[in-house]
Amino acid sequence: MEDLLNEVVPQEDLERFEKKYHHELELDGEVTTDTKFEYAFCLVRSRYTNDVRKGIMILEELARTHPDGRRDYIYYLAFGNARIKEYTSGLKYCRAFLDIESNDQVRSLEEYIKKEIDKEVAKGMVVAGGAALVLGGILGLGIAMARNKQKREK
């Protein structure tokens, strides 16, 4: 799954679908659902976080307004959120997808996200533990210095 998440869209594909998207927007003032999806699909696979976020926004709008393609939109919402390490959102979309249907690829993505969440929690605990040790050390040093000062004054 990690390989799939790290795979990026070729720049020429992204540019082609971006051009198509903007062409439709300029021509008709609207963009077809298919073009929006194609563009969002490329964006969530971009190497740039801002592109991925833009793709997520388009997919969220599609999921709200076009229930026919909801399954695909939800999958790529989970995928895009996982790519930018928004694991809570990614997990939410995985579960929403699995409510619609069972799918091994989505289950694999869900497991990957859960492992990443566990890693984040572990990192947080290490940082908190380290901070507590540093604080304890500083406090201990302060107490020792205060005692030493009291002994000298006697």
From Swiss-Prot:
What is the protein name given in its UniProt record? Answer: Mitochondrial fission 1 protein
Q: What happens when the gene is disrupted?
A: RNAi-mediated knockdown results in elongated mitochondria.
Its primary localisation, in coarse terms, equals: mitochondrion
Give the Mitochondrial intermembrane compartment stretches of this protein: 146-154
Q: State the family it belongs to.
A: Belongs to the FIS1 family.
Function text = Involved in the fragmentation of the mitochondrial network and its perinuclear clustering. Functions downstream of Pink1 and upstream of Drp1 to regulate mitochondrial fission.
Native species: Drosophila melanogaster (Fruit fly)
Compartment list: Mitochondrion outer membrane
